[in-house]
Amino acid sequence: MMKTLRIILAFLLLTAAGGLQARTFNDKVLNRPYADMRKWHLGFSVGMYVSDIRFTHNGFITPEGQQWRLDQPGYQPGFCVNGLFDLRLNNYFSVRFTPGMYFGSRDVRMVDVDGDLTERQNLKSTFVVLPIELKYSAMRWRNARPYLVGGVMPAFDVGKKRSDFLQLKSSDIYLTVGFGFDFYLPYFKLVPELNFCFGLSDVLVHDRPDLIDDPDKFKYTQSLTKATSKMVILTFYFE
């Protein structure tokens, strides 16, 4: 969670720096005054993200008397790239489609509650995401314009490999909410954005016929009722 806070702090610092730069331009000239009047906006983004997986336990106890708890002990930043297709509805609202790819991994720790046994598993993912969002922009203040954004993000894991202990589903859908700033530079718009994504479905595969002959590995899945995902995403759009 500390890394997430650092990302948010870095976003605020970068936004403040961008605001100072925009104010410098504000005192001289209004950059790209008709940019927001276009019906379509195209662009791309690069960024980073951290993901978290939350486990709901059911109190399962193995025949040996073991009770296992699973958690994600740390966060590993991932990398993401997106395209941008923005359809203007009116002066304040637009609809965005930002397909992209996310590359990352998550470490999962399995701990025996009453003993000192510990197992670990690294879950690597390559997501194809298809976010559709509604963007609300406030009034432009010279060369800066804040906005809010929200929507849904279907995600498909195309790089998922067979897992020894846990196996996650290849698709999920996220509810997204975020905010950002349009900074109008002389030749393009720079748009830093912070987005929070909340997985809506159980991503744990409960039916594991591949482990029918290895119940010692299946016990981790048996210990869980469900698993849900969350993401915090920091992106920089160029329009």
What is the meaning of each model-derived region?
Residues 143-146, 162, 166, 188-191:
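Short conserved catalytic/interaction loops centered on acidic-Pro-aromatic/His motifs
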Residues 176-184, 189:
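Conserved C-terminal beta-signal and adjacent last beta-strands/turns
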Residues 35-39, 70-78, 121-129, 166-174, ...:
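Transmembrane beta-barrel outer-membrane domains
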Residues 29, 186-239:
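Predominantly the C-terminal beta-signal and adjacent terminal strand-loop region
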Residues 56-72, 104-125, 158-168, 204-224:
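Flexible, solvent-exposed loop segments that connect beta-strands
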Residues 31, 36-40, 48-54, 84-160, ...:
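Gram-negative (and chloroplast) outer-membrane scaffold detector with strong preference
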Residues 1-27, 236-239:
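Bacterial Sec-dependent N-terminal signal peptides
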Residues 22-76, 237-239:
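Short glycine/proline- and aromatic-enriched beta-strand/turn motifs that initiate or cap beta-hairpins
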